[in-house]
């Protein structure tokens, strides 16, 4: 018998049946486990992505929180510096005012001391002048004066000296 060039042979049918059986076996034994592995891997990747997104959002929230805390700290620091500057200026003003008051007190005391010293010197000069006048008058009169005459001469002399000024 001659074999046909194109035809279905038993070998070909067995190969197709064997291929189909191997396909079913592989599908039953390998396809589902591989599919489960792929599905598991896909779920792991999705959960990792979700965790990454969650961590990113938490990081952004923490960043915003830290930035707000930093801004608050900066504002608080500036307020502290401002208050310290105000207190320093007030203290400086108090010190300057106290120094001015002390200077005025010292100046007034010095003026008072000068006036007292001036009066003292004037009184000493008056006494010296009256002694000199008495001495000159006694030389002129050549006699001693009694106390009442002496005081009268002194007062007249002082009046004349005061008017001469």
From Swiss-Prot:
CDD domains: ATP-synt_Fo_b (cd06503)
Membrane topology: Single-pass membrane protein
MF-aspect GO terms: proton-transporting ATP synthase activity, rotational mechanism; proton-transporting ATPase activity, rotational mechanism
Membrane-spanning segments: 5-25
InterPro entries in the cross-refs: ATP_synth_B-like_membr_sf, ATP_synth_b/b'su_bac/chlpt, ATP_synth_F0_bsu_bac, ATP_synthase_B_chain
Keyword Transport: yes
Pfam families the record matches: ATP-synt_B
Alphabetical UniProt keywords: ATP synthesis, Cell membrane, CF(0), Hydrogen ion transport, Ion transport, Membrane, Transmembrane, Transmembrane helix, Transport
GO cellular component terms, semicolon-separated: plasma membrane; proton-transporting ATP synthase complex
Gene3D superfamilies associated with the record: 6.10.250.1580
Keyword Protein biosynthesis annotated: no
Subcellular location: Cell membrane
Biological role: F(1)F(0) ATP synthase produces ATP from ADP in the presence of a proton or sodium gradient. F-type ATPases consist of two structural domains, F(1) containing the extramembraneous catalytic core and F(0) containing the membrane proton channel, linked together by a central stalk and a peripheral stalk. During catalysis, ATP synthesis in the catalytic domain of F(1) is coupled via a rotary mechanism of the central stalk subunits to proton translocation. Component of the F(0) channel, it forms part of the peripheral stalk, linking F(1) to F(0).
Family according to the record: Belongs to the ATPase B chain family.
Subunit structure: F-type ATPases have 2 components, F(1) - the catalytic core - and F(0) - the membrane proton channel. F(1) has five subunits: alpha(3), beta(3), gamma(1), delta(1), epsilon(1). F(0) has three main subunits: a(1), b(2) and c(10-14). The alpha and beta chains form an alternating ring which encloses part of the gamma chain. F(1) is attached to F(0) by a central stalk formed by the gamma and epsilon chains, while a peripheral stalk is formed by the delta and b chains.
Protein name: ATP synthase subunit b
């Amino acid at each position: 018998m001659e074999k046909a060039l194109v035809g279905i042979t038993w070998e070909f049918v067995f190969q197709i049946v064997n291929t189909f059986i191997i396909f079913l076996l592989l599908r039953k034994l390998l396809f589902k486990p591989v599919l489960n592995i792929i599905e598991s891997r896909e779920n792991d990747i999705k959960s990792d992505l979700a965790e990454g997104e969650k961590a990113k959002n938490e990081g952004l929230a923490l960043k915003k929180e830290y930035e707000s805390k930093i801004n608050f700290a900066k504002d608080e620091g500036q307020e502290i510096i401002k208050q310290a500057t105000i207190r320093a200026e007030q203290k400086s003003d108090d010190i300057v005012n106290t120094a001015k008051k002390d200077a005025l007190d010292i100046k007034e005391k010095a003026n008072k001391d000068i006036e007292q010293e001036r009066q003292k010197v004037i009184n000493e000069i008056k006494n010296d002048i009256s002694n000199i006048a008495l001495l000159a008058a006694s030389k002129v009169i050549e006699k001693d004066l009694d106390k009442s005459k002496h005081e009268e001469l002194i007062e007249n002399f002082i009046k004349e000296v005061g008017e001469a000024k």
